[in-house]
Amino acid sequence: MGIVVLGAVFVDIKGYPLSTYIPGGRNAGRIEQVHGGVSRNVVEDIANVELRPTFVSLVDDTGMGQDVIDKLENHKVNTQYIQRVPDGMGTWLAIFDNDGDVHAAISKRPDTTPLTTLLEEKGDEIFKDCDAIAIELDLEKDTVKQVLRYARKYNKKVFAAVSNMSIAMERRDYLQQIDCFVCNQQEAGLLFSDDYGHLSPTQMAQVLARNVHSANMTSMVVTMGGLGAVYAQHDGACGVVPAKKVDVIDTTGAGDAFFAGTVIGLTYGKNLAQSCEIGSRLAASVICITENVCPRFRPLEFGLDVPVVD
């Protein structure tokens, strides 16, 4: 059944300046509207490596909601567990500067409580034969609890990302039950009540190793933008994965692609360092294009012996 991904769908509204961006001023530019959301991007990234993931989520009961389902089906994502409900999708509004980085953003989260009912009815069917589980940690508490219960029942690995760290902090105790948690440097600072902005990757890796051990977590990865990423495991092993050097067009979705690559590697036999390397390659492929998901790859390009099912 492949990797099961759970989370929310967003509509991304992105504004780009045509000339030098003036904070607080009027800026002529272009505006794009695309399908987004951390987990929606992640499931499409996984599908673009010719793997066949399953998406458990919600969409609006409108034409836009159907468009989201149609696009995912075109990429060979199993969409049978996507429910259509009123106001099922969130909205993310972002303004980019001239370097392709987000200058300001605001989001409206959807109500994801219907996922709890869906998992009560079909949880065994969804998780019994899956290869692994990827989840947004800031879903409803009951939903996260259900997923972790099914993971224990069927002995499945669970990997977690985050879209709103303030909400995810309320689920901090669940991190001990997650096989690998991935977030960025700022989010890691919130998680451990510290400021890591001044640390080099090597220093960050050492700090992370201590924090992962003391918090009784299995493993964790922190992305550091252009400096790459660092990882640490409960046994104290840690390391740095340098970023790939590419021309930046649009950074949207790079973190999601990194998470997708890391999940793919850890699911299909790679160690944490090798998995982060896959994540780094997928992230680089997103940064240098205008899309917020990676282009098509084949598993063998990452040393994965996974049969491609057409």
For each of these PLM feature ranges, what is it?
Residues 71-86:
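A glycine-rich helix N-cap at a beta->alpha junction
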